[in-house]
Amino acid sequence: MNVLLDTSIFLGKFLYYFLESLYYKIIPKKKKDVTGEIVLITGAASGLGRLLAIKFASLGAILVLWDINEEGNMETCRIIKEERDAKVFAYTCDCSNRQDVYRVADQVKKEVGNVTILINNAGVVTGREFLKTPDHMVERSFLVNVMSHFWTYKAFLPAMLEANHGHLVCISSFAGIVGINELSDYCASKFAAYGFAESLHFELKLLQKSKINTTIVCPYFIKTGMFEGCSTKYPLLLPMLTQEYAAQSILNAILEEQLYLIMPRFSHVALFLKQIISTNMMMTMAEYLGMDISLASFIEREKSGEVQTKTEGKQQ
C-alpha cells in the first residue's frame, strides 16, 4: 500500500471511531448481561470488593471471592446468600504469593469453572515518606498491587483466549497516573498495574481477541479502611469517593465495556493540565487542592504507633 492509501484508511477509521465515541457520550452503551458469568473478585472481604460482589450477585452472576482475610471473606459470602439466592464461592488466598494464587486458581477451575470476569481489586498502602518505608513494605506493595495481576492473568486468561470471551478489570488508582507525595511505593505499583493492563489490552486486540474486554479504573481516594483519615481540602472539586458511588461507577463501566474509568470527573482536568503546565504550576495546584497534606492524619496515626491493617499488608 502507498502512503496516500494508508493515510486515507487511517483518516476514515479515525473519523468513524471519533463519531462513535461522541455518540456513546450522548447515548450510553447497552449494558451487557452478566447472568451466569463467573466473576472472581480479589480483596472481597470488605470495602469496595464486598460491594462489587453484592452488586454482581444481584445481576445473576456466579461469585468467586478471594481474600487473605478468611473471616471477612466468609462474611461477604454470608451477606450475599442472606440477601438473595446466589451462587457464591469463598476462597482464602494470599494474592502476594504466586504459588498460592496458582493453587487456589486450580481449585476454582475444578470446583466452579472458568472465570470469565476477573476483577483485580486487592490492594495495600503504606503511606510513609520514601526513606521511612521499610523494604518489606515496598515489596508487599508491589506483590499485592501489581504482581498478583500477572499471576491471576496467567491463571485465568488462557481459558478466556480459547473461548474468545472474558473481561479483565484492573483497579488501579488516580495515584497510578499522577504522583502523590508520601505514596511513592503505592504510586509506583499502581502505575505498573495501569501499564500492565493497558499493554495487555492492546496485545489482545492485535491477537484479534475482540471479545476479551479490559476496564482500567483510576479512582481518587475512596472512603474505605484503606485510606481512613485521609482528607481533601475542597471536597466539591476533589472529593473523597463514597464506596457506593465508586462501586456503582465501576459496575457500570464493566457492563458498558468501558476501557478507562477515572473518578471523580475533575481528575480528568488535573490529568490534562499535567501534560501542558510547568512543574511549579503543578505544585501550586497540588497545594491549592490540599494534595500535599491529604495524608496528614493517616501518617499521624502511623507515627502514633496505632496498628493499621492497611500497613500490615491486609488485602482490602
From Swiss-Prot:
Residues annotated as binding substrate: S173
Annotated signal peptide: none
Protein family (similarity comment): Belongs to the short-chain dehydrogenases/reductases (SDR) family.
Active site, UniProt feature: Y186 (proton acceptor)
Keywords on record: NAD, NADP, Oxidoreductase
Keyword NADP among UniProt keywords: yes
Binding residue positions for NAD(+): 40-64
Gene Ontology CC annotation, any one: lipid droplet
Entry GO MF terms: oxidoreductase activity, acting on the CH-OH group of donors, NAD or NADP as acceptor
Main enzyme class: oxidoreductase
Domain of life of the native organism: Eukaryota
Pfam families membership: adh_short
EC number: 1.1.1.-
Protein name: Short-chain dehydrogenase/reductase family 16C member 6
